[in-house]
Amino acid sequence: MIYQAKTLQVKQLANGIAELSFCAPASVNKLDLHTLESLDKALDALAADSSVKGLLLSSDKEAFIVGADITEFLGLFAKPEAELDEWLQFANRIFNKLEDLPFPTLSALKGHTLGGGCECVLATDFRIGDATTSIGLPETKLGIMPGFGGTVRLPRLIGADSAMEIITQGKACRAEEALKVGLLDAIVDSDKLIDSAITTLTQAIEEKLDWQKRRQQKTSALTLSKLEAMMSFTMAKGMVAQVAGKHYPAPMTSVVTIEEAARLPRDAALDIERKHFIKLAKSTEAQALVGIFLNDQYIKGLAKQSAKAASQDTQHAAVLGAGIMGGGIAYQSALKGVPVLMKDIAPHSLELGMTEAAKLLNKQLERGKIDGFKMAGILASITPSLHYAGIDQADVIVEAVVENPKVKAAVLSEVEGLVDTETILTSNTSTIPINLLAKSLKRPQNFCGMHFFNPVHRMPLVEIIRGEHTSEDTINRVVAYAAKMGKSPIVVNDCPGFFVNRVLFPYFAGFSLLMRDGANFTEIDKVMERQFGWPMGPAYLLDVVGIDTAHHAQAVMAEGFPTRMAKSGREAIDALYEAKKFGQKNGSGFYQYTVDKKGKPKKAFSDDVLAILAPVCGAPQSFDPQTLIERTMIPMINEVVLCLEEGIIASAQEADMALVYGLGFPPFRGGVFRYLDTIGIANYVAMAEKYADLGALYQVPQLLKNMAQQGTSFYSAQQVSAL
């Protein structure tokens, strides 16, 4: 043994070849601080051993290295710039040391080789992998960019254009693509990976392969003419500006970094990379996006805990109520391997549900995600039925009938009598209290809410609503089932609107108050989309939700929270509802909708709506963008904080992920609690108090006032991952 540490070891093989194997005691290998320090010492030991003629890098895991340890990021990023610079220099010295070893080096890859793992193997002379290999640099998805030499070595290895595509998109290349672009030198069978690696290294040691020429290419300047460089970088900047936009600076910064370093040798190029990395690491976007990653891990950790604690796994499911929503739920369950009975009283609804499932599967087929055999198998695992035969096989039943409390209660009560005492019943509802529906059941402990978002196949969030009598095992089993479906389940306590709709309607109320005061709805949409970063402004979102749906939900919220959410008079939603302008669903709401060539609704403004809205709108008045943002967001932010204060949602992490996954809250802002930390809670309190005269929705919760006085925040700089 040449060197041994907790997460890696170096041993001597035959013919002067040494093997450095990453072997962390955890389920995956990560390039955390400890592993980097161990790698540094291992490379020193190798350089000092004159018997070593070649080095093989390998892994004892299914994945080579999944990347750096992201749980360390926020703590590192919070350090002074000088300390961050030192850390990056330390890491780069290690990879330079690997690249500069006086003998050939090769990485034998399998599974994921991502982020810092990819940057590590870029420092070796050769890379071979098996068919499972996936190699890439996902850092821009976290608001940062490669910082261990990725922007320097990758363009010199595979060319600037291919490198910029991989880096700016945060893309991982599968084995065949990696071979095509030059990231891999060969793909071999898994059982021959190490033997092939040794053969290749032996050829390099015997100088049958020119490893020094390869190394020279990676440590020199890029070989681009001035014209080639101008065309390449101009085109890349144009593409990135169009796709990433101004709220996500990391992709553009990556292009600028590669451009600035193009004519420099390795060490000077690494200085450029380090400078830009530090700037991104200190950005609020990076804090938010890294925070989202960690929060997502937290949610997954909670789901794993629930699955472990659950009394049984869900092997069979049932959906009551077909149509688009029922079909979407059935599709998602079947796709992830849980057969499902889809029951409805109307043949045309069953047909619609099966058509929806088939349509979604056809899209998967067209994209090459599944083959025809797999598609047929998934469709066969959805059983449409007009009767309850087979319902007793279901471990979890999702009721998804019409949004009417009497109908839902009747269906739930009926099906409860047909299943055994272990079966879990859930209701897919957006507005009906779970405690109300539970009154119709003999076993309310086996019942909870399971609120899917539309379209089911695309929206990651499922709200799991705990009723007054819901047992912990019911919650655990339903959370585990939602996770098995590939969803992000978040548990909330029962209240009108649950969490997502409860916090959404104050946002709509702020929008309505602005219109009452003379603001133009198209201007509000423009500001909330382009400046704040919502995928849709409030008027557009109301059209997509459906004006009729929103009108009904608004009444539910007003009844549930009369102090804050009761209307003071007719509003824009009322005017459109009365005019039967229901939004996208019937082609007319705030905007007019026509179907484009792809069958998607396209919106356009029409003056016709102004006459309908005139009675509920004040005289036209101009507001600056910041005022529009503040007046729409403060009611939502206050309500989110109240939900945490009241225990409707358990943590800031879960609330922020529910907002991002359920409402499309701008990821670069990280959710309401991350946003509050970013702008400063004391600053928020002072800002919100300027609008106190607008009513109860604008009253700052006591929790925020206390935190402002104490100078505390929701997230500490050293945020750790879950569980």
Curated annotation (Swiss-Prot):
Annotated binding of substrate, by residue: D296, N501, Y661
TM region(s), chain numbering: none
Protein name as catalogued: Fatty acid oxidation complex subunit alpha
Keyword Lyase: yes
Single Gene Ontology MF annotation: 3-hydroxybutyryl-CoA epimerase activity
EC number: 4.2.1.17, 5.1.2.3, 5.3.3.8, 1.1.1.35
Protein's pathway: Lipid metabolism; fatty acid beta-oxidation
Gene behind the chain: fadB
